């Protein structure tokens, strides 16, 4: 018998971290919620990371997802910005792990391919397909829409991931 799995997708960012929650039952997806957690740019880095952690922890506590998916970050020419984004990504991995959730990471191209069918696409295409796949989905920011796309990607890939984890457990035990 299939079970409903609640998934949180997280799109890390230091200014805004998007989150999106979907429920997956077999091949059907249902929108649960989405939003952003923000940090105050006037504050020091440690305080901003704390704000992101507290905000994500509240979302996790409120919606009680079963699994989490986080997008890999890309490296750009600005090393300082890349490092700060990496630290925000660390928070995006830490918060669900602290809540006891299995966390899976996806490359941006994998997310695009899962949602629009190709690994290279525009944000508008992704946002449109999120609405096609889940007509009741609502999102106020691009970050929240991207987070929903990450959750959708995980819903599409999770069965093979679950099977691989079971196989590893059997081989280890």
Curated annotation (Swiss-Prot):
Keyword DNA-binding: yes
Annotated catalytic residues: 11, 71, 143
One of the GO biological process terms: DNA recombination
GO cellular component: a single term: Holliday junction resolvase complex
Top EC class for this record: hydrolase
Residues given in the record as Mg(2+) 2 binding sites: 71
Lineage start: Bacteria, Pseudomonadati, Pseudomonadota, Alphaproteobacteria, Hyphomicrobiales
The name this protein goes by in its record: Crossover junction endodeoxyribonuclease RuvC
The protein's Enzyme Commission number: 3.1.21.10
Compartments, record wording: Cytoplasm
Cofactor binding note of this UniProt entry: Binds 2 Mg(2+) ion per subunit.
GO molecular function: crossover junction DNA endonuclease activity; DNA binding; magnesium ion binding
């Amino acid at each position: 018998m299939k079970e409903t799995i609640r998934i949180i997708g997280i799109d890390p960012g230091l200014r805004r971290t998007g989150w999106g929650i979907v429920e997956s039952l077999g091949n059907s997806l249902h929108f649960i919620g989405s939003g952003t957690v923000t940090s105050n740019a006037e504050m020091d880095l440690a305080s901003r990371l704390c704000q992101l952690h507290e905000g994500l922890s509240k979302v996790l506590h409120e919606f009680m997802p079963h699994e989490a998916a986080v997008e890999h970050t890309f490296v750009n020419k600005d090393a300082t910005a890349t490092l700060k984004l990496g630290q925000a990504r660390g928070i995006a991995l830490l918060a669900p792990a602290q809540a006891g959730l299995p966390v899976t990471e996806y490359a941006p191209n994998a997310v695009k391919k899962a949602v629009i069918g190709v690994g290279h696409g525009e944000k508008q295409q992704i946002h449109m397909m999120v609405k096609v796949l889940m007509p009741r989905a609502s999102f106020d920011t691009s970050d929240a829409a991207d987070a929903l796309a990450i959750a959708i990607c995980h819903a599409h890939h999770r069965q093979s991931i679950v099977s691989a984890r079971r196989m590893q457990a059997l081989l280890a035990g």
